[in-house]
C-alpha cells in the first residue's frame, strides 16, 4: 500500500516522496522480494499501490525535473493532498516514458506482481504545461488524457494479464474512457455497506458489475463510524468484484468464519455476477 517507497525523502506522511518509486529500505530492508515470497508461501497473489501521475514538491523527482509538473507560467503552484501534491505533465513524452518506466521496472524486477492499485488523489489544479505550445494550453484536459492513454496502451501491450484497479479519491476514475486499460474501478472511498447499497445500485445503471470494485471493510466503518454485522457487509460486497479491506490481525473469529464462507460462496456464483446476462 501507500508508503513502501522513498529514499532521500521517505514516505512517512502524505506530503513527500511521490515520484521517487524506489523501495524504502528502512521500512523494507529485504525489499519487495521478501514480501512477495511471504505472500506466495501463504497462497496469496501479491499486489502493490502506486500513483504514477502525481509528484510531491518534496521529492527527488521534482528537484531534478520541476518542469515536469503541470504549471502556469508566472503563477504560484497550487497544491493538493498533503499541501505538496501536484500532477505530472503527462502531455510531455518524457513524462510518459517515466510513468511507463515506473510500472515496467516494478513488473520487470518482480514478475510475480499480479495486481496494481493505480491511485489518483489530486485533481488538475495547475492549468498549464511547459511542454505544450501556447495555442494548445486551453486543451490541457484533452492533451493530458491523450498522454495518459499512450502510457496505458504501452503498459497493456506489455503486461496484458496484470490486474489493474483505477482508483481516484473514490469514484473519480469511474469512466468508460479508462476501462479499456483498467480491469476495475473503485466505486467510492466510502465503504459503509448500508450506503454502498445506494452507490452500487446507481453505478450499476451505467457500468457492469465486473468493473465495480466492492470490498468488505471494517466495523465500525472508517468513514461513517457505523457498526454493521459482518454478514451484511459480505453480502453487499458480493454484488460486484468482491475484495477485502480488513486487517487480519484485528478480525474476530466470527469475521474470519463469515468472510471465508463469503469468498467460497462468491466463487460459486462469480461467473453469473460478473459475466451473466439479464
Where do the protein language model's features map onto the residues?
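Glycan-recognition surfaces
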Residues: 56-57, 61-97, 142-249
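Glycan-recognition and catalytic regions of carbohydrate-active enzymes
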Residues: 245-278
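Active-site-proximal structural scaffolding
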Residues: 14, 21, 28, 32, ...
